[in-house]
């Protein structure tokens, strides 16, 4: 059955000697099943393909390429595609510079790129492979000694979820920030440790955990809380992928460094 939108993340059964094709705006994923072998090919799209889609095609339609990868797994049948967040922090460059005045709070909805993960199901379930779906650039965040390697991309700051267009290759992160200081909080770069976030699936959008940041000033600890329940912006959300590095409760030390760097203090 052909699928579009976030339905491309439904479990699938790939028949023997057939190919499954997931097509995203900037990348297509091909998976062929032959006996206990899984053949996988990831190709960049020459142009934006628009909405995501999934379908089963004949082997004769698979692209000729030397880049096919081959995996062995004795279980067969149902495969689980999953959206997962990148393996490094993401530095986001907003489309405009904003300043949060002292004593004020705001919420933004940020669109984070997701990766494609394919796993087998059954008793011997295993991860087969992961692949980025967007073009990300490597960037260094922080000073030369204590900084870290990140993924970088430009983004738009949404004030309401209604302005976010549904997309199967992006997850929405609600970020609430309180400026509990007497200092202006300037937004020039936003660094998010996405490896601490899970992904949930709603009826319209993919979501991450909500983040709640309390800024105390450039020389004081800043608090960041990861809300582990699904965000309350859609009904009947279900978890689809866990955080790579789960974090619990309020995070003081790491949060201060993140906010200190991304606001250029």
Regions found by a protein language model. Give the residues of each.
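Interface-prone segments of viral and bacterial extracellular assemblies
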Residues: 1-265
């Amino acid at each position: 059955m052909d699928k579009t939108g976030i339905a491309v993340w439904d479990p699938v059964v790939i028949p023997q000697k057939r190919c499954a094709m997931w097509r995203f705006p900037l990348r297509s994923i091909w998976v062929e099943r032959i006996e206990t072998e899984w053949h996988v090919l990831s190709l960049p799209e020459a142009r934006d393909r628009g909405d995501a889609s999934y379908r089963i095609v004949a082997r004769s339609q698979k692209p000729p390429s030397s880049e096919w990868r081959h995996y062995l797994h004795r279980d067969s049948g149902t495969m689980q595609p999953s959206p997962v967040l990148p393996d490094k922090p993401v530095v986001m460059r907003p489309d405009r510079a904003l300043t949060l005045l002292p004593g004020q709070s705001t919420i933004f909805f940020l669109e984070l790129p997701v990766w494609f993960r394919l796993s087998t199901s059954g008793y011997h379930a295993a991860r087969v492979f992961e692949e980025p779906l967007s073009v990300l650039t490597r960037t260094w965040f922080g000073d030369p000694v204590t900084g870290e390697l990140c993924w970088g991309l430009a983004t738009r700051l949404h004030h309401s979820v209604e302005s976010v267009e549904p997309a199967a290759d992006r997850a929405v992160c609600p970020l609430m920030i309180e400026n509990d200081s007497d200092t202006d909080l300037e937004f020039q770069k936003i660094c998010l440790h996405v490896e601490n976030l899970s992904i949930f699936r709603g009826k319209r959008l993919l979501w991450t955990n909500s983040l709640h940041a309390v800024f105390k000033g450039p020389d004081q600890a800043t608090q960041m809380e990861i809300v582990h329940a699904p965000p309350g912006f859609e009904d009947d959300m279900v978890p689809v992928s866990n955080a790579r590095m789960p974090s619990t409760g309020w995070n003081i030390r790491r949060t201060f460094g993140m906010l200190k760097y991304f606001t250029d203090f």
